[in-house]
UniProtKB/Swiss-Prot annotation:
Gene: dapF
UniProt lineage: Bacteria, Pseudomonadati, Spirochaetota, Spirochaetia, Leptospirales
Transmembrane segments: none
Gene3D superfamilies: Diaminopimelate Epimerase, Chain A, domain 1 (3.10.310.10)
Protein name per UniProt: Diaminopimelate epimerase
Similarity comment: Belongs to the diaminopimelate epimerase family.
Organism in which the protein naturally occurs: Leptospira biflexa serovar Patoc (strain Patoc 1 / Ames)
Length: 280
């Protein structure tokens, strides 16, 4: 079977995008792993199908590079917005996208060539109730600045869900931190029944943070949009920043704002890398 695809990236968080609005394309976990393979496939952090939706204009159906399904990807949903607009699936510059977190509204900003360059996403309200993050914890109070022990060392973390679970940890120097050693241990920690994405964060200045992310089912990625939203929420809850934050990641920069009304807004670029046809 031959499939048309488009490779896209949002500050280095790259996925293989497949338009399934006309044909109901479904792939097995093994096929998704094959497409995501950076040596023997197209290469990416996973595969995202763009489908028709009964609750929004389109649905984002997302899978990690290991073939497991995922609820949400902030960088991914920005690229979905660019895809549906640039490829003529909609003329609406404020399309609604159904995700595992619910229906999100995007605000598309086009450049001089008429193509989408920047996207702002209303990511909705963060989820802090432990049972909904989810995290195995006593009580219903948000898990803020609590202790997790890894390899005999204690780390303070805050648990936030942006439709997918995040564990935010502050370190002195995230760039020098052993993310690939500690990340997978926390990802699979008994605290987190559905595993967890882990953010390692250092403070660069006033309302300016640096983030590295270990994504569940994928490993370290150059960027994580929902992670940046979770980091912003955690930073405000811990009194480290104001409500509008610049977050630098290895792939680029995102601007996140947690508004007083509860919604988190994420702004960042979306780019198309190349497109083609693949035998699967």
């Amino acid at each position: 079977m031959k499939i048309n695809f488009t490779k896209m990236e949002g500050i280095g968080n790259d996925y293989v995008y497949i338009d399934a609005t006309k044909n109901d394309i479904r792939l097995s976990p093994e096929q998704i792993q094959k497409l995501s393979d950076r040596n023997f496939g197209i290469g990416g952090d996973g595969v995202i199908f763009i489908r028709n939706s009964n609750s929004g204009e389109f649905q984002m159906d997302m899978y990690n590079s290991d073939g497991s399904s995922s609820e949400m990807c902030g960088n991914g949903v920005r690229c979905v917005g660019k895809f549906v607009y640039d490829h003529g699936l909609t003329k609406n510059q404020k399309p609604t996208i159904e995700t595992g977190k619910g229906v999100l509204t995007l605000d598309l900003k086009t450049g001089t060539n008429g193509k989408v360059e920047m996207v702002t996403v209303d990511m909705g309200e963060p989820i802090l109730k432990p049972s909904l993050v989810p995290i195995v914890w006593k009580g219903d109070e948000p898990v803020i600045n609590q202790v997790i022990e890894v390899q005999g060392k204690q780390y303070h973390f805050t648990a936030v869900s942006m439709g997918n679970p995040h564990c935010v940890i502050y370190v002195d120097d995230a760039d020098d931190f052993p993310v690939r050693e500690i990340g997978p241990i926390i990802e699979n920690h008994p605290f987190f029944p559905r595993r967890v994405n882990v953010e390692f964060v250092s403070i660069k200045g006033k309302d300016h943070l640096y983030q590295r992310t270990w994504e569940r089912g994928t490993g370290e990625t150059l960027a994580c949009g929902t992670g940046a939203c979770a980091v912003t929420v955690a930073s405000i809850l811990n009194g480290k920043t104001g409500r509008s934050v610049r977050i630098d990641l290895r792939g680029g920069t995102l601007h996140i704002e947690w508004q007083e009304n509860g919604s988190v807004f994420m702004t960042g670029p979306a780019k198309e890398v190349f497109s083609g046809e693949v035998e699967i």
